[in-house]
Amino acid sequence: MKQLRIPAVFMRGGTSNAVVLHERDLPRDRAQWDEIFLAAIGSPDPYGRQLDGMGGGISSLSKVCVVGPSTRPDADIDYTFAQVQVKEAKVDYSGNCGNMSSAMGPFAVDEGLVKVSGKEALVRIHNTNTRKIIHARFALDDGKAAVDG
């Protein structure tokens, strides 16, 4: 694959880490996403180390999240979760990751996708994998997510 330049944020959510991308920066054809995600994470890696990418060699460190404007009136953002296999060239979109779901509200606020004010934010997240709405409530510090750790 030819090297691409795609803006990304490497973000922690609970015990997981993920490469987080804006949907606007990815090809409209989702069939092209797998190749990009595999390259970004460093899969497949028969040795299970993912040294050529941002993955950490275990499933909790081999994730990609895509965030964009909501397609539903009852949500602020859409969030698509991708679990990238470590040793195989496979990307699974069938589930969700609760740990990374907790990071999508702060990501949306910090990236300016959701406007907030005050000391607390509530971001309504539409998980496109499960078609569920997740409410993320978190503290703010000067208009950004207040994050420790």
PLM region spans:
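A glycine-rich beta-to-alpha transition motif near the start of alpha/beta enzyme domains, typified by
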Residues: 1-149
